[in-house]
From Swiss-Prot:
GO terms for cellular component: plasma membrane. This is Phosphate import ATP-binding protein PstB 1. It is a peripheral membrane protein. NCBIfam families: 3a0107s01c2. InterPro entries: AAA+_ATPase (IPR003593), ABC_transporter-like_ATP-bd (IPR003439), ABC_transporter-like_CS (IPR017871), P-loop_NTPase (IPR027417), PstB-like (IPR005670). SUPFAM superfamilies: P-loop containing nucleoside triphosphate hydrolases (SSF52540). Its main location: membrane. CDD domains: ABC_PstB_phosphate_transporter. Residues 27-268 form the ABC transporter domain. Signal peptide: none annotated. The keyword S-adenosyl-L-methionine does not apply.
């Protein structure tokens, strides 16, 4: 798969994810293992995720792809008995270092979950919620941020005349775009999407997929999906995870047309998984 270069206006070959420079890397995962109590969920994973592109994690149910995603903003910390070995570096800084402030990390690495989870507030208050937590009180600044975020999430034209209505009045697809707007309002560097369309209808799914293409012009996007066709459509690079191990990681076109590992080929062609 070739990646659009929004600056130059033409298509360029994808980066070689196995030979990224530090300048090209947003997230560096180094010998990462994760344990729930005594059970190992991830085993010695090392990979680099490039800046400003979409990386997909695929694999069978229970393979560890969502667990790996949640390591990138330490959401697994919320699960009792979790232990992590190895490092996850965001722009060169290990996010598991004791000095790291986790709330600040999660502002830098936003996350959107499988099912839309708007707050029981107005559309407007959902979008500016994180900004208010940061102490921003200026009405003009909040208004501008709300509009910019809703536009970026391809939702502004649908809700601009109903900003103060309850967010629960939106459709499922609209709610998911609202959640994306809420995530990007605080200007994260990375956006994590955990099966963001699995609960949506096909039309809403297409809208979200088109949005993902737009988002990568400003953010590094990492998506977990059980839908291989979706991974092929939206991602520049794909990692195949199986039984907590990284089996293969390359540009998406190579993964889907000429995988190097038999396990990857078997999964892609439906022989197991």
């Amino acid at each position: 798969m070739y990646s659009a270069n929004p600056t130059l206006g033409y298509y360029v070959p994808p980066l070689d994810v196995n030979n990224l420079t530090d300048q090209q890397t947003a997230i560096s995962i180094e010998h990462l293992s994760l344990y729930y109590q005594q059970s190992r969920a991830l085993s010695d994973i090392s990979m680099r995720i490039p800046k400003g592109q979409v990386t997909a994690f695929i694999g069978p149910s229970g393979c560890g792809k969502s667990t790996l995603l949640r390591c990138i903003n330490r959401m697994n910390d919320l699960v009792e008995g979790t232990r992590v070995e190895g490092e996850v570096k965001l722009h060169g800084k290990n996010i598991y270092h004791p000095d790291v402030d986790v709330p600040t990390l999660r502002r830098r690495v936003g996350m959107v979950f499988q099912r839309p989870n708007p707050f029981p507030k107005s559309i407007y208050e959902n979008v500016v919620y994180g900004l208010r937590l940061q102490g921003i009180k200026n009405s003009r600044a909040l208004d501008d941020a709300a509009e910019q975020s809703l536009r970026a999430a391809a939702l502004w034209d649908e809700v601009k005349h109903r900003l103060h209505e309850n967010a629960f009045g939106l459709s499922g697809g609209q709610q998911q775009r609202l959640v994306i707007a809420r995530a990007i309002a605080i200007e994260p560097e990375v956006l994590l999407l955990d099966e963001p369309t699995s609960a949506l209808d096909p039309i809403s799914t297409l809208t979200i997929e088109e949005l993902i293409h737009d988002l990568k012009t400003k953010y590094t996007v990492v998506i977990v999906t059980h839908n291989m066709q979706q991974a092929a459509r939206v991602s520049d690079h794909t990692a195949f995870i199986h039984m907590g191990k990284l089996i293969e990681y390359a540009d998406t076109d190579s993964i889907f047309t000429s995988p190097l590992k038999k396990q990857t080929e078997d999964y892609i062609t439906g022989r197991y998984g």
